[in-house]
Amino acid sequence: MKNRFLYLPIVFVFLIVQAHAKDLKWVQRVEPTNWWTEMSQQEFQLMLNGVDLQSAEITIQSEGVTISRKVLTDNPDYVFLYLKVAKNAIHGKFNIILKKGKKTQTIVYELKQRRKGSSERKSFTEADAIYLLMPDRFANGNPANDSITGYHQGVHRNIPGARHGGDIEGIISRIPYLADLGITTLWTTPLFDNNDTQYSYHQYACSDYYKIDPRLGKNEDYLRLSEACHLNGLKLIIDVVPNHCGSSHWWMKDLPAKDWINTWPTYTSSNYRMTAWTDPHASTADLYRLTHGWFAPNMPDLNLQNPLLFDYLRQVYVFWIETANIDGMRVDTYPYNEIRTAARFIQSIRNEYPNMNVVGECWVKTPAEVAYYQSGNKNKDDFDSHLSSVMDFCLKDVFSSAFNESEGWDTGMSRFYSLYAQDFVYANPMMIMNFLDNHDIDRYSIAVKRDVRKFKMGLAMLLTARGFPQIYYGTEIMLDGIPGDYQGHRFDFPGGWPEDKRNAFTTKGRTADENEVFDYLKTLLVYRKNNTVLQSGLMKQFIPENGIYVNFRYNQTKTIMIIANNNEQEKVLDVKRFKEMIAGKTEGKEITTSKTYSLQNLISIPAKTVLIVEIK
């Protein structure tokens, strides 16, 4: 197992000039840097970038690879070759020859042998618990790469919006910690090169799709991260960003085509109104602004409707899935693209990996809108996103409000009841990703004003909800933040840096409150990991009464009763009302305390507490 990736180095294209003149290196960049035999789609795109390439005659010396077409754009410095790989093609290197008159340049390109069973790889499911982290803010395992010559930003931990030095090596060193916590899947925000002049730490403004940012590590380190995950029983999710690149991307100085990005006479942002896609009365102007406006001034809006860019980006993610043995995808800002093009884009990747699941960021505020984006939903317009999962921003809003409110018809615990009552709109409510917070919104600790009782209620409701949970790094220690401030959502994990005064990755390095939260979450995660009833079990809920909300998760072998008391006082619950679920059962054990409860008559529930009772 330790040598799994020795056969998968990222081989860069060799450019060999077969002439004496120094100026004959017409081709300066070839992407992707390698490809594979035995892919489902036999044809792949090869982008050549250099100087006046369109005047060159191009041939290939290979028995198993042929040029199926050559596509030119309005920029003479680019040529797009579509190469067809025969089904019986043998892996190895072959020559691509460019000729201008008597002068030639030879590119040595490599086809690798595809990993056996690659297309059948398994993905994350409703059985998983996902841990989201920002690499720059999690742990610094290699201080030597903190600042790199030629990159605008180095490390300044005292500046919230600067780079802080976390890296892939730091993540690798903490994989056993995540496995012990009960995490089964890791999602990192992007790792691609990002040489922006400010806020480059978030990595969402890519400068080079085939290069891991050297301040995070080397390309080979990403492979090591994947191996570490798999050796410890974790899956790995890649963050897919088809909507935009970074203004520092190498092609921004010489765009492959005029319509490679969406442009305006002056800078124009998106209107960010994703509701326009489901609005039956939406104007064309609003939809155009949504999809063609830029997400931010430093994030040029990619024109995914350009077929050359479409194929280029598709191959980027296939390349990394294949190279680093990735298990799943999360798609950033999905509705900011023309959604039918985005759907084809995701489908084209899943054609290579039929079992791969994909969760989409579709930041809308009603269940009907969220459901529209889950694959399999019977939409009136027949739209299918090809997203097997969606992020439940509606449930996130309930978590942020319910425990701070007094009970009313539509406040407090009634929020949970009313939201779950709308699950009929989903094609598959068990494949929805639930979360308390993430890197784009306020920390959950802020929402509940650092009240440990409320925080634990949120964790309990999250880990027992239909769908599957996503935990944001630091949630296990109730990490603090600053409301309404992106940088305030992304504090460093204490102990991730050698110079930190304490190490919250350890029991001794945590406060009493932090250990209480950590131990509680770990108990819930481990229980969920080992009990399918909380992964795929059916759900039944009862209308909240007197500030107490009860629901059940159940399957053929086990029943779990979840009792949430949102009152500031201890309450007594008469369980006779729930006889359809507990008839014939006499007792149950609360999974976080191991306390036994009689189911004969009354149960006392402490104030601001969720009991999770396994019925015997």
What are these regions (language model features)?
Residues 1-26:
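Bacterial Sec-dependent N-terminal signal peptides
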Residues 22-54, 107, 111-116, 120:
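Beta-strand/beta-sandwich contexts
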Residues 39-102:
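Immunoglobulin-like IPT/TIG beta-sandwich domains and homologous Ig-like subdomains
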Residues 122-127, 179-181, 187, 229-231, ...:
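Extracellular/periplasmic catalytic domains that process cell-envelope and extracellular macromolecules
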Residues 138-184, 188-318, 323, 342-352, ...:
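Substrate-binding/active-site clefts of carbohydrate-active enzymes
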Residues 226, 244, 316, 322, ...:
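Active-site-proximal helices and loops of the catalytic beta/alpha 8
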